[in-house]
Amino acid sequence: MALRRVLVDRIVRSCAARAFASTSASYASARDALKEERPPTADELAAIPRERTRNFSIIAHVDHGKSTLADRLLELTGAIKRDGSNKQVLDTLPVERRRGITVKAQAVSILHREPSDGQAYLLNLIDTPGHADFSFEVSRSLSACDGAVMLVDATQGVEAQTIATFYLALDRNLAIVPAANKVDMTSADVERVAKQMERAFGVEREDVLEVSGKTGHNAEKVLSAVVKHVPHPSGDPNGPLRVLLLDCHYDDYRGAVNIVQVADGVIRKGDKVSSCASGQHFEVLELGMMTPERTKTDAMYAGQVGYMITNVRDVRSSKVGDTLHMKNEPVEPLAGIRPAKPMVFQGLYPVNSDDFEKLKAAVSKLTLNDASVTAQTENSTALGAGFRCGFLGLLHADVFHQRLQEEFGAEIIATAPTVPYRIKHANDEAYIDCTSPLAIPSGGFPSKGTEIEEPLVEATIICQPHVVGKVVELCMDRRGEQLEQNFLDDSRVILRYRLPLGEVAADFADELKSRSSGYATFDYDDAGMAKSDIVRMDVLVNGSVVDALATLVHRSKAQRHGRDLVARLKEALPRQLYEVALQAALGSKVIARETISAMRKNVTAKCYGGDISRKKKLLEKQKEGKRRMRRIGNVDIPNETFAGILSNKRN
């Protein structure tokens, strides 16, 4: 029987391989029929009317194949040559290619000739990130779209971030084109995934496209579905000019390069435009579309997405979500984009304090390129001058650190992540925001009458039924409150929990992956604030408070966290000539302690026999000297040691 199953499996695999070899051939024939072997010219782009323009995005969970499918669509329409080296063409950052994830949303304009009517259509494709930390990029991209291709991995099924991005699209009334990707994989189960999509999103089975981003199978059907189901832009081509600023990045040669969508009217090279937000005036020096390289055009019309370069080089003059209009012709601003809300804060300091100006320049340029990052200067007694930066999540922070190192050569120390708390002291009437432990006085915080609120999130977790118990145990340990538990199908369970953001921001994702053997996924959304018993925990080295190691923790977790922190500190600090006490304290109450024993010099080595009192005298003298050193000595903590101590996990 076992041999029979092996033979049947080989036959199935062989048939599948032949089937997809034929689909690759059909993809090649479709490519030859639908495209020319070159990107579109400026004249061809400008000739497409608004009625034959489609703005759409590809949305999905991370690693479900968005960028790979985008590569096939670009090849199919001739935007790029068909080449085996085409991988993540729209992922231009080094960190994106190294990690295999999309961090920055990218736009590209392609021409597609629809077989059903023979007409050429201008399709503006926006490739979006899939990770929860980059939801701001997704939200910003969808604001320029009229529809979205919702991609689901046929080998994995609907995931937590699939649901999150679906509701983002639904909130904007976008037309949805459902598609199951990776159908060429032998482990793909299209019918099961289609049923999940029916249950989770209310789509019809016959509307679910079966595609392969790897082979290009049915890629032409994706384009046809976009033309058929996604409406054209609704702007007024004859109305007053209104341009939505979607993104901005800095070019070393051209200065600020703005990614824009023309909502109404026409914008031409040489026009004078003004900002609704600041009132500042600009002159349009260059505009065009991305094909995916910049293609200059003389004008951009209502509904089109492209780039614009003005006479202002400073990126800070460009505010994402701003509305631009003709100078001296004021208009009603567009709805714009909801500002990003930082969820995690970290202190960033240079390893060498002399490199602060270099770090300042690097942070300034990166924050201008990433509107979701906030940065304010901050000073630490231990680490010197640095920045308190706000991020959308830990992956977002990690990518920012990596870009600082790769693009600017900045070596940094990142403090432990904190979340934004709100504090109201006894005599105050309103709450104040607190994003850093350094903003709170040490010694007995909170004082009597002080109220503290911590941020909450509603987490959506999708896992297999046999690990539900472990996931529930993890959520309860993180002070979670269960809101809902449903079966997506017989192999998927959806859990919804209300959790403190501080518990999620630390290592929740890693613990979830560990307890579910890597199969559980989760996404979260803001759920407001709630009162909580938060305390400031200080770390003392030889009796002196080290401000860089201060943290805000829940009282119930303080002792566990304190023990772990002083244990890591003991491992990292070099031994001294005297005994060093490491303590974690809540005000004056010590909750954890470790001791680094002194290095012992053998002062009796020169004594060769004789009276024992001579040895005792030397030992007493050594002991007194160490007591004096312990009273007046300062332990110097190297910056490299801080980097190891402040990591989330213990080695």
From Swiss-Prot:
One of its GO terms (molecular function) is GTPase activity. Keywords: GTP-binding, Hydrolase, Membrane, Mitochondrion, Mitochondrion inner membrane, Nucleotide-binding, Protein biosynthesis. PROSITE patterns: G_TR_1 (PS00301), G_TR_2 (PS51722). It catalyses: GTP + H2O = GDP + phosphate + H(+). The keyword Protein biosynthesis applies. Coiled coil: none annotated. Its EC number is 3.6.5.-. It is a peripheral membrane protein. GTP binds at residues 60-67, 127-131, 181-184. NCBIfam families: lepA, small_GTP. Belongs to the TRAFAC class translation factor GTPase superfamily. Classic translation factor GTPase family. LepA subfamily. Promotes mitochondrial protein synthesis. May act as a fidelity factor of the translation reaction, by catalyzing a one-codon backward translocation of tRNAs on improperly translocated ribosomes. Binds to mitochondrial ribosomes in a GTP-dependent manner. This is Translation factor GUF1 homolog, mitochondrial. It comes from Ostreococcus lucimarinus (strain CCE9901).
